[in-house]
Regions:
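Bacterial Sec-dependent N-terminal signal peptides
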Residues: 1-25
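Carbohydrate-active catalytic/glycan-binding domains of CAZyme proteins
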Residues: 20-310
């Protein structure tokens, strides 16, 4: 009887050890960032609760491509094989593409790659590429804003500030689809973020870049590449840009750059129709400029902190 009792305890102990070893690793939110004038490189913020953010000191990727060698609007996503892909704006004007690099630990990065995006040589700019992994078609979708003078009704905007959204796709960052028009909402538009809520249920957060609006709106679609519904009324005040969306609990947080006030704003929503301003409930370090939020393991954060301390 005693022997059986010891056997039972041993089995119970091993079961507990096995359960502990297979429990999921703790996750954190990480926010890609840059500081003006955007020539230093990639920075990170991190958060445990999605509300309160701390910086991880240091530069983790210095820009080395493009006419101006900038790193603005860093957008990141994790794809198959636990590989993180980063895209960014390389110049204010003059480049016909955007930057790309990949990493498994957010510290050691591949050689930087200029992805050619626009074939029309009159294109003024390629701004704010946003990367999204489409798990249905198993491909990456990159959306950005460009001005092509004379191509669209400019309204009150100048030809060099009359943006529309374009996109391309890739599975391997070696072969790319042709560039296509992503969205022409009838006004100058930049800073588009795709959010998947459910199968055949996608949300697009975008910036109406016309004067005096300069604010954020919403559109809906059954596909990540549209077609999209007519853009909603604005859900932020004027001079808002660079949105990023993350899910905290059962609600979505939309962080955005209130660039005239030089602070970060945040909205909370469960349906992308009704919004609650939670700007006073969140904390963002000074100097942070807009990137994107994703979730990473505790070991990734630990590695970044260790690298920062060197």
């Amino acid at each position: 009887m005693k022997h059986r009792h010891l056997q039972f305890i041993a089995v119970l102990f091993l079961t507990m050890i096995s359960a502990c070893s297979t429990s999921p690793e703790k996750e954190y939110y990480i926010f890609t960032s840059f500081h003006e004038p955007a020539n230093e490189g990639l920075r990170y913020l991190y958060s445990e609760d999605g509300y309160h953010w701390d910086s991880i000191p240091g530069i983790f990727l210095k820009p080395a491509i493009g006419k101006q060698q900038l790193m603005r609007d860093p957008s990141i996503v994790k794809g198959p094989g636990d590989i993180y892909h980063l895209v960014w704006t390389t110049s204010w004007k003059g480049d016909l593409g955007f930057g790309h690099a990949q990493s498994k630990d957010l510290i050691n990065w591949s050689e930087q790659q200029m992805i050619h995006a626009m074939s029309d040589t009159t294109t003024v700019n390629v701004w704010a590429p946003e990367i999204f992994y489409d798990d249905v078609d198993e491909q990456y979708i990159i959306v950005w804003a460009s001005c092509v003078p004379g191509k669209f009704d400019r309204g009150i905007e100048d030809e060099d500030n009359n943006h529309r959204l374009y996109y391309l796709t890739t599975r391997d960052f070696e072969t790319f689809s042709e560039t296509k028009l992503f969205l022409d909402p009838g006004f100058s538009v930049i800073d588009a973020v795709i959010v998947k809520r459910n199968p055949e249920d996608y949300v697009l957060v975008l910036k109406d870049n016309t004067r005096p609006n300069r604010n954020l709106k919403i559109a809906f679609s059954q596909s990540p590449v549209g077609s999209f519904s007519e853009a909603s009324e604005a859900f932020t005040g004027e001079f808002s840009e660079g949105p990023t969306v993350t899910k905290v609990g059962e609600e979505y947080f939309i962080y955005y750059d209130m660039y005239r006030e030089k602070i970060y704003g945040a909205m909370k929503t469960s349906d992308f129709i009704n919004f609650e301003d939670i700007t006073n409930e969140v904390s963002i370090p000074n100097g942070h400029k807009h990137g994107t939020i994703t979730r990473v393991s505790a070991s990734i954060i630990e590695g970044l902190k260790n690298q920062s301390a060197k």
